[in-house]
């Protein structure tokens, strides 16, 4: 990619997300989504290869289809209500179409087929943007229309997403696919609590971004994309050996790490609304998510593959570029739970 084009592309993505998040008019919301999508495609194809081209094509076709459904829903809603503002989305069928379009953009089940493949076909840092920044615009739309959403449909999509993300991550050796399936699971938790308490969705999104960013930065330091490469971390970057397992356990939601906080407050919110069966199902299915993280940690940190003495001394010659925000992110990933009462008080 031309270095001169990078500032333009990244500023377009930032502007598109900002327009969508701050706009209350459906047309400008749609324009922001389109800016975001078209500017992100060059990032996916930064390293030209058949795999990246395939990933960009899948991303474009999925997002374009979702945008078409969204535009159809916007036009239908404007014809029925005579309004273009997002707060007037009270008609049933346009609201259902908007939910399906946003579920497709977020990669929720049963529209999740593109997320693992696109993430696997991109570099680590492009995958980080795909699984974090690209979620902001659709979630901001869902947040603004949360009062008019169909609760039963949203809960169905959420449980399906948790099931797809938890079962899909089993038997995976590619780390990017594992993080993609984890993202699908987290989207299910976020959308499940949205009709009851939208602020909890924002809290969940914030913690999810912190955890995912930390995981991708740690993997990028070691250039680890598979389980085998991750198992060689100890002899390249010794100080990463305890940090990667703790980050993965936090992503899996193991207490007392930070990743347990969203699940804790979401289950509490469901309990306040006299709903016990749904959070129980969600929590039980999510145990599969924690299981494949535990298995990944066991195979990479506890077991030791046979290797020569020359490989064992490799850590003496490894030099990595400093990552300024990584210590702060690691601290937030593991130790944010004790200050959770203060965070909940703000919300």
Swiss-Prot record:
Pfam families: NADH_dehy_S2_C (PF06444), Proton_antipo_M (PF00361). GO terms for molecular function: NADH dehydrogenase (ubiquinone) activity. One of its GO terms (biological process) is mitochondrial respiratory chain complex I assembly. It catalyses: a ubiquinone + NADH + 5 H(+)(in) = a ubiquinol + NAD(+) + 4 H(+)(out). InterPro entries: Complex_I_Subunit_2, NADH_DH_su2_C, NADH_UbQ_OxRdtase_chain2, ND/Mrp_TM. Its EC number is 7.1.1.2. The chain crosses the membrane at residues 13-33, 60-80, 96-116, 123-143, 149-169, 178-198, 201-221, 247-267, 274-294, 326-346. It is a multi-pass membrane protein. Keywords: Electron transport, Membrane, Mitochondrion, Mitochondrion inner membrane, NAD, Respiratory chain, Translocase, Transmembrane, Transmembrane helix, Transport, Ubiquinone. One of its GO terms (cellular component) is respiratory chain complex I. The keyword Metal-binding does not apply. It is found in: Mitochondrion inner membrane. It comes from the Eukaryota. It is an enzyme of class 7 (translocase). Belongs to the complex I subunit 2 family. Core subunit of the mitochondrial membrane respiratory chain NADH dehydrogenase (Complex I) which catalyzes electron transfer from NADH through the respiratory chain, using ubiquinone as an electron acceptor. Essential for the catalytic activity and assembly of complex I. Core subunit of respiratory chain NADH dehydrogenase (Complex I) which is composed of 45 different subunits. Interacts with TMEM242. This is NADH-ubiquinone oxidoreductase chain 2. It comes from Pan troglodytes (Chimpanzee).
